C-alpha cells in the first residue's frame, strides 16, 4: 500500500530540512511511519493477512535502522524527530 502523491508531498513539506530535500533521514522516517500506521490500521481489520504483516515488519526494521543512523550522526535531530512523530524510544 503505497502512499498517495499528495500525502507524500505533505510529509516532505513538513519534515524536509531544505527546499528540495526528499531523501533526508527525517523525511524517510516520516514516510515510513505513515505507511506503518496505515498498515497497522489495515491489519486491525484483516487479522489473517500475514503477507501484509511480513511487509509491515520489514518497514519497521527499515525505520529502526534509519533511526539508529540518525541517532548516531546527530542526536539532537533524532530527539526532535522522535518527539514530532510521537515514537517511543
UniProtKB/Swiss-Prot annotation:
InterPro entries, per the entry: Ribosomal_uS15, Ribosomal_uS15_bac-type, uS15_NS1_RNA-bd_sf
Domain of life: Bacteria
Alphabetical keyword list: Ribonucleoprotein, Ribosomal protein, RNA-binding, rRNA-binding
Pfam families (UniProt xref): Ribosomal_S15
CDD domains documented for this protein: Ribosomal_S15p_S13e
Keyword Cytoplasm: no
Keyword Transferase: no
A cellular component term, taken from the record's GO annotations: cytosolic small ribosomal subunit
GO biological process terms on file: translation
Molecular function GO terms recorded: rRNA binding; structural constituent of ribosome
Family designation: Belongs to the universal ribosomal protein uS15 family.
Quaternary assembly: Part of the 30S ribosomal subunit. Forms a bridge to the 50S subunit in the 70S ribosome, contacting the 23S rRNA.
Record function comment: One of the primary rRNA binding proteins, it binds directly to 16S rRNA where it helps nucleate assembly of the platform of the 30S subunit by binding and bridging several RNA helices of the 16S rRNA. Forms an intersubunit bridge (bridge B4) with the 23S rRNA of the 50S subunit in the ribosome.
Name of protein: Small ribosomal subunit protein uS15
